[in-house]
Amino acid sequence: MSEESDSLRTSPSVASLSENELPLPPPDPPGYVCSLTEDLVTKAREELQEKPEWRLRDVQALRDMVRKEYPYLSTSLDDAFLLRFLRARKFDYDRALQLLVNYHGCRRSWPEVFSNLRPSALKDVLNSGFLTVLPHTDPRGCHVLCIRPDRWIPSNYPITENIRAVYLTLEKLIQSEETQVNGIVILADYKGVSLSKASHFGPFIAKKVIGILQDGFPIRIKAVHIVNEPRIFKGIFAIIKPFLKEKIANRFFLHGSDLNSLHTNLPRNILPKEYGGTAGELDTASWNAVLLASEEDFVKEFCQPMPACDNLLGQPLLPEGLISDAQCDDSMRAMKSQLYSCY
């Protein structure tokens, strides 16, 4: 059996306190049952500082911090939900709390994206083939989110609808504990992206999207692979680079039309034939069905009125470290120069 076959895995359908400060917690209650394999438990321990024997103690510590510091924050406090934030910040309580606050702050600060966020409201985007999740994970166990901007026709709906579809997909993926530990990989195909289409993704949109992905959502982005990027992508990347932290910027890989380069990172046996793979034609319908089957969950989470008292005592809820509006203006001018210089 080849090395690629051995690595093939099928995706599912879908600063801690010192150990001496608190006693060991009792066994996990029925409310939380760990679904991680032994290998993933080991990986979580080594990479995320997650210790099964302290897991519920850590969750309780974060829960207590939320209740004390943000008593009016309308958020789930169940074990499984809070674990997402602890894992995303390697069980550093303070950073996990900030991520949780940012998560809700981002949702409140961009109603065009987060209001009425449910699969049935995004059928046009889903049916366009703009995005899907490949049926197999990569050798590291990462889900592969495939995005194809050329499938978007701007006259049909605004770019924010695409962003809503991406966020919807991330919300579904992060429900899996496997994804919380392994993270995801993004494969973006920029074939056919024109100057007029690229101009819709300006610095103001980029600032918000990058802010959410880096500071406002509990997911680990392990790599971003760009293929078939036209000359215009030099301008697109100039838009987003100022907002990227060095760690994530170093995880961008531009392959052009060199599929052999892509295959050194994503093996052929997990890729559809459109990208030189052996996993059949790209299937978008299966992932669409997964999302549409989750309609009720999204209605409960994103389609309920916000409690009047949920204002976090008037504190701002925007991710820290984002570039100012003045800098956005500078980026817009630079972006226009970059875009036109590509032609």
UniProtKB/Swiss-Prot annotation:
Residues 118-283 form the CRAL-TRIO domain. Disulfide bonds: none annotated. It comes from the Eukaryota. The gene is Ttpal. Pfam families: CRAL_TRIO, CRAL_TRIO_N. Residues 1-29 are annotated as: Disordered. Transmembrane segments: none annotated. Residues 8-19 have a biased composition (Polar residues). It comes from Mus musculus (Mouse). May act as a protein that binds a hydrophobic ligand. This is Alpha-tocopherol transfer protein-like. InterPro entries: CRAL-TRIO_dom, CRAL-TRIO_dom_sf, CRAL/TRIO_N_dom, CRAL/TRIO_N_dom_sf. Keywords: Transport. PANTHER family: ALPHA-TOCOPHEROL TRANSFER PROTEIN-LIKE, ALPHA-TOCOPHEROL TRANSFER PROTEIN-RELATED.
